[in-house]
From Swiss-Prot:
PANTHER family: HEMOLYSIN-RELATED (PTHR22777), POLYAMINE EXPORT PROTEIN (PTHR22777:SF16)
InterPro entries, A to Z: CBS_dom (IPR000644), CBS_dom_sf (IPR046342), CNNM (IPR002550), FAD-bd_PCMH-like_sf (IPR036318), FAD-bd_PCMH_sub2 (IPR016169), Ion_transp-like_CBS (IPR044751), Transptr-assoc_dom (IPR005170)
Principal place of residence: membrane
Membrane topology: Multi-pass membrane protein
Name of the featured protein: Polyamine export protein
Cytoplasmic face of the membrane: 1-4, 76-99, 163-447
Effect of a null allele: Deletion mutant loses viability in stationary phase when grown in acidic medium with nitrite. Mutant is sensitive to cadaverine and putrescine but not to spermine or spermidine at pH 9.
GO cellular component labels: plasma membrane
Periplasmic side: 26-54, 121-141
Signal peptide boundaries: none
TM ranges: 5-25, 55-75, 100-120, 142-162
Family: Belongs to the UPF0053 family. PaeA subfamily.
GO molecular function annotation: flavin adenine dinucleotide binding
Amino acid sequence: MLNSIFIIFCLIAVSAFFSISEISLAASRKIKLKLLADEGSINAQRVLKMQENPGMFFTVVQIGLNAVAILGGIVGDAAFSPAFSALFSHYMSPELSEQLSFILSFSLVTGLFILFADLTPKRIGMIAPEAVALRIINPMRFCLFVFRPLVWLFNGMANNIFRLFKIPMVRKDDITSDDIYAVVEAGALAGVLRKQEHELIENVFELESRTVPSSMTSRESIIWFDLHEDEQSLKKKVAEHPHSKFLVCNEDIDHIIGYVDSKDLLNRVLANQSMALNSGVQIRNTLIVPDTLTLSEALESFKTAGEDFAVIMNEYALVVGIITLNDVMTTLMGDLVGQGLEEQIVARDENSWLVDGGTPIDDVMRVLDIDEFPQSGNYETIGGFMMFMLRKIPKRTDSVKFSGYKFEVVDIDNYRIDQLLVTRLDNKSNVPAPKLPDAQGKEDSAA
């Protein structure tokens, strides 16, 4: 009996090895293994190679687990049934004692295998899959060598079944932006990433999705020089609006000549020379980009052209705004470089905010914790959202209710929404989804 018990514990150990091997090799993260492989870990390279063809080691694992389970049942019955049968034979008939002995020995062996050969090793493998995989990879390679004929047979039959049902046989480990978002979110929740680091990483990915109008200075806010403007007017504009660069146009903003650098104008003033643009002031060529460009593409354009200032035009060759490298970096770095800028979203109290109409919709989503605005591809700013929902040129007191918030127009500047009051509704969870834009516009205009 002692020999049988020893054999059972050996079988449990073998089964535990296959269980921990299966879960650790399957759960090991490819990114972490690649880092270890780049540092020179040969075992990490071997684990990666085995993960490329998981059918091989899964076949070995299943052969081992099933063989050990069958042997465990046979040995367990032979080891414990006679002892239980002898014990129960004093109290019941031989037939009944044999049946009860078989049930008890089966339950005992099964319990031992479940606890020590399955649950415990698999939980260990899940806790530290990469560390375990690096330790068991060489014994697993030896098992692959020993069972190669059986592996070839069963793996070949499994591959034919996969081909029959057109199931891919290689695991796809393509990493998407959503995967990285999830990892970053998990890192923030776990405290591994600080709030600023979390926001910075999110902003990096937003550069690919946000277009230049979301960060530009809009057309009506551009301070520009007319080519024939007198010197006093130019000095007044420079004094009132101390920008580093000024657009130069001919009669109107849509006829662009170029731009002048404030440093060049200052040098002329210090040299007692005229600031008039037709008196020899250097007018530089302007980088012009379409309004469909993403911020990431705008960065590439700045790099290629060697500029940090660009004019944004729409499909009708009309100027819609200007964007600078600093605008893009402010979007990327947030508060780290935008300390001196006027806040676009100002909290009045814990349930209300004053929001600039030109605030990018992504910034509003982040502050108000709104997952998505309806048909957000049709607008870039919160003012655009209001016009889209109202289906008209907005006026003061016009409002829209969405996602548990009331968005109310409080200030208009030349038909443009200058400021909104956003209020959190008490019954946020019960607020219905917004109606179709036409219906919503009629409802709000009647309010």
